[in-house]
């Protein structure tokens, strides 16, 4: 009976992986972008990537100042910021395609909230929500190390496919939400774990785009979709 159950589990995992592979080219862009009215794949819900460094705060960009790169478009708050970006895009682009830096440590391309961010070692990291940011801050170096190693293998994959594969075949260092919460509570006995509903796998992987919670105000202030 145990052998049968193990075989069934493996079959289910292979079925999920096969589905994920079929989605690689059709479902989910490789970047955490959302389409504007013109159909352009806008990053950071239209927030200015340069302003995180120059202003130290999330700052809305303007479609008047935009730069189109392969598979992604950035808005800027000013022509000056646009010029800074043009001179050195690598310096200002968010890490891991703008996906949640916490999820990237487990090969998951999920979530993007431009108001949940951190600059660490001169690199911009974006998180899917307050839970992802809180988890990442437990050990930034650990998360960056694992994400940097995994990212080359998933960078070109659509976000749905990459995430489905990651859930089906978890990396050896995978941690559940409960495990991360337990680590947090041990390190921060006087601070409660953030109360936040991430929205569920169906919405996050199938019916919504990266950044939908931030854009639509799901449990937080609505940032809106880019024009």
How would you describe each model-predicted region?
Residues 27-70, 91-227:
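Intrinsically disordered, low-complexity terminal tails and linkers in eukaryotic proteins, enriched
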Residues 78-81, 129:
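Beta-edge loop/turn motif
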Residues 5, 11-25:
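Bacterial N-terminal signal peptides
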Residues 69-78:
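Short, well-structured hydrophobic secondary-structure segments
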């Amino acid at each position: 009976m145990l052998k049968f159950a193990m075989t069934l589990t493996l079959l289910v995992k292979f079925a999920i992986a096969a589905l994920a592979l079929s989605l690689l080219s059709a479902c989910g862009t490789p970047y955490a972008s959302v389409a504007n009215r013109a159909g352009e794949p806008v990053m950071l819900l239209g927030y200015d990537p340069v302003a995180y460094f120059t202003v130290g705060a999330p700052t809305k960009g303007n479609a008047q100042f935009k730069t189109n790169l392969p598979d992604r478009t950035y808005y800027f708050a000013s022509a000056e910021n646009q010029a800074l970006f043009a001179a050195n895009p690598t310096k200002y682009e968010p890490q891991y395609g703008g996906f949640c830096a916490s999820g990237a440590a487990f090969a998951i391309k999920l979530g993007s909230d431009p108001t949940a961010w951190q600059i660490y070692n001169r690199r911009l990291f974006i998180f899917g929500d307050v839970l992802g940011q809180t988890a990442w801050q437990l050990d930034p170096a650990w998360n960056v190390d694992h994400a940097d190693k995994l990212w080359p293998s998933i960078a070109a994959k659509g976000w749905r496919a990459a995430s489905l594969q990651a859930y089906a075949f978890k990396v050896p260092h995978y941690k559940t939400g409960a495990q991360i919460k337990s680590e947090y509570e041990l390190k921060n006995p006087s601070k409660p774990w953030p109360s936040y509903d991430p929205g569920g796998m169906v919405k996050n992987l199938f019916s919504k785009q990266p950044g939908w919670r931030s854009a639509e105000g799901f449990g937080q202030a609505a940032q809106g979709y880019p024009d």
